Structure formats: structure tokens, C-alpha cells
Amino acid sequence: MSQIQTRTEPMVINMGPHHPSMHGVLRLIVTLDGEDVIDCEPVIGYLHRGMEKIAENRTNTMFVPYVSRWDYAAGMFNEAVTVNAPEQLADIAVPKRASYIRVIMLELNRIANHLLWLGPFLADVGAQTPFFYIFREREMIYDLWEAATGYRMVNNNYFRIGGVAADLPYGWVDKCEDFCDYFLPKVDEYERLITNNPIFRRRIMGLGVISREEAINWGLSGPMLRASGVKWDLRKVDHYECYDDFDWEVHWEKDGDCLARYLVRIREMRESVNIIRQAIKGLPGGPYENLEAKRMAEGPKSEWNDFDYQFLGKKIPPTFKIPKGEHYVRIESGKGEIGIYIIGDNNIFPWRFKIRAADFVNLQIFPHILQGAKVADLVAILGSIDIIMGSVDR
């Protein structure tokens, strides 16, 4: 009896840009052979707003409120790297207290970023309950931000060249400690609900595997890189801010699949609480911003009416000129390495302001790891990458 031969042709389908699982306005042109994915072409740019060109027509002080719109789930990281670039280019010192406050804010943002990743990712694979839990904890972080900066989710506009915009208000430190005490048991609750759930583990284990060599060759960073067996964290590597003052570990996994990326992020939330507690305990006194506006055109010291004087101002002036030179600054955001390549030419505007977004680079490997996967696994693999289209498109 002869076997019946069936011949199928590849089918091309569009996912997005208006799709609840695309995590923004991302369009995927997916080529399928039955249930198997043959090819996938991401189409980006729907949220492009010309952020780099805007930066080149604004002073650094004027541009800080804009940057929260890149990765609108991690505005503090955007602000930090934006002010770090001219600080390092112009050799501006940041007071110790301001550096500690920055670390506290950055680690709160890392927790908020991972929470906002966790809820939709679990909803993508069919677990709805934790989706509502994560917003409960994020609201507490937003309350802390509102008390310190006046705003909740984006546009905190808190970081300044040489420090931060305002000191922590009375009682804020106690509220932050209360949040840390409250949040750690909640992470244990997530683990009980999710990590040890056999249905969840079977659903994502072995999906979207990225080897150590692939992760390095594709330029991945953040949890995507650490989940593939590379123990690389810019907080340890570049020694920026005051992370060297604290005792903390870099968490990593070897399997490189969706489950490994989940485990890295869960453990990073615990580690962020550990860093915040140490920063609060050792929070020094002193100014919260650099009180010497010593990078004005006159230089560090000038003569005026035959007197030597040191110009003291409350803040770095809005007309602060970026010295001639070029510099690349990077920090470890919740998604990976976010960097700024800045070129100054003794003007108040940067000559070039290049943004290196972590999720834009991490998204490049998506078609590669999707080949041969089932179409039902597409959304789970995409969710494990953690992208925000405002940051991808800029």
C-alpha cells in the first residue's frame, strides 16, 4: 500500500503591531511550515521619535526629562546614563550622598522593571494570577518615587549633572526599609506559585536556548547574557556609582533557555533588596549635588575686580558646555547594557548623541532562536527577552 504524500507550502502570517503579546508596537512577519516556524522578520520603527536628534538640539540639562520615554519601564536608568556621560567627559565629581541615593533609585527601578516583565511574561504562558500581584508591589515603588521625585512611573526628572534634583524627604528612608521588609516574602510567594509549578516548568524549559558563544557573538547583555553562562554585570565590571561599597553577588545560569532567564531575574530582585538595605544603612551625610559649578567658561578660578574668587553656584548651570572630546558611558539596566556615545565640541549641545539600547540589541537574536520552534512558543520566547518598544525604536 503506497504512502500518501502531502505537500505543504509555507504560510506567511503577520503578528502585530497591535497584538497584546507583542509588548508594544512590534510587527513580526512569521513564515510557518504547519506549526513550525521557518523564519521570522521583526519590523520595528513604529515608535521612533528621533530621540538622538532631539538630544543634539538640547542642552544636557534640558534633555533629562525626555529620556524617560526611551524605556518607559526603567526611566531612572535612562536618566543615570544621560547625566553620567557629561559627568565623565567633563570630570565632574558626584558627592557620596548623591551616589548612594542614585544607587537606591536604580535598584528600585530594577525591581520595578523585573516585576513589569514578570507579570506579562507569565500571562503570555497562561498564568494570570501573578499578573495582578506584581502591580501591587510596583505601586509601592511608585509611591516611594512620588514622595522623592514628585512623579510616579516616567518623567521622574530626578538625576542631575553632579548629583540629584532634591534630597530624600523626611521619613522616606523608613518607608523604603518597610518596602524591603514587605517585598522579600512576596518574592518567596512568587517562587512558590511559579518556580516550582510543574506546568510552568514544562511550558518554558528548553525554549529559546542561547549558548554561551551565541550570547557573546550577538552582543547580548543583562539577564539574557547571564542566563547563558556568562557572569558579566557592569556594576561589577565598570565600578560606576558606589556599587563597590556593597556586598552583593552576580546571579547567572548555564542553560540559556526561558526558564534560566526567569530564574536570573527573580534572583536579581532579591539581590536588589540586599543592595538597597546596605545603601540605606550606610547613607552618608553631606550635599546631594555638586555645589561647585566649576565647569563654566571662566574656568575653576577667575579674577574679578582684582580679587581671586571661586564661583559657587547651586547647580551646574543650564549653559554648561560639553568639553571637546568623545566618550562612551554604559550602565547595567534591568534589560542589560544601556550606553551613550557622546561627542562634545565645546558647545552647550552635544555634536553626537548615540543611544545603545539593551533590548534593541537583545531583540536581534530573536529570529535566530525562533527557527524550528513551534508557533505556540513564539510568544513565550519573545516575552523572555524583555523588550520595550520605546527603547527599541527610540
From Swiss-Prot:
Q: Does the keyword Protein transport apply?
A: no
Tell me which Gene Ontology terms the entry assigns under biological process: photosynthesis, light reaction
Q: Which Gene3D superfamilies match?
A: Cytochrome-c3 Hydrogenase, chain B
MF terms (GO), sorted A to Z: NAD binding; oxidoreductase activity, acting on NAD(P)H, quinone or similar compound as acceptor; quinone binding
Recorded catalytic activity of this chain's protein: a plastoquinone + NADH + (n+1) H(+)(in) = a plastoquinol + NAD(+) + n H(+)(out); a plastoquinone + NADPH + (n+1) H(+)(in) = a plastoquinol + NADP(+) + n H(+)(out)
Write out the entry's keywords from A to Z.
Answer: Membrane, NAD, NADP, Plastoquinone, Quinone, Thylakoid, Translocase, Transport
For membrane topology, the record states: Peripheral membrane protein
Its Enzyme Commission number(s) read: 7.1.1.-
Any one cellular component term from GO for this entry? Answer: plasma membrane-derived thylakoid membrane
Question: Where in the cell?
Answer: Cellular thylakoid membrane
Matching entries from InterPro entries are given as: NADH_Q_OxRdtase_suD, NADH_UbQ_OxRdtase_49kDa_CS, NDH1_su_D/H, NiFe-Hase_large
Keyword Cell wall biogenesis/degradation assigned: no
User: What is the purpose of this protein?
Assistant: NDH-1 shuttles electrons from an unknown electron donor, via FMN and iron-sulfur (Fe-S) centers, to quinones in the respiratory and/or the photosynthetic chain. The immediate electron acceptor for the enzyme in this species is believed to be plastoquinone. Couples the redox reaction to proton translocation, and thus conserves the redox energy in a proton gradient. Cyanobacterial NDH-1 also plays a role in inorganic carbon-concentration.
The record's similarity note reads: Belongs to the complex I 49 kDa subunit family.
Q: Which HAMAP family match?
A: NDH1_NuoD (MF_01358)
> What is annotated about its quaternary structure and interactions?
NDH-1 can be composed of about 15 different subunits; different subcomplexes with different compositions have been identified which probably have different functions.
Q: NCBIfam families, alphabetically?
A: NuoD (TIGR01962), PRK06075.1 (NF004739), PRK07415.1 (NF005649)
Q: What is the name attached to this protein's record?
A: NAD(P)H-quinone oxidoreductase subunit H
Organism equals Trichodesmium erythraeum (strain IMS101)
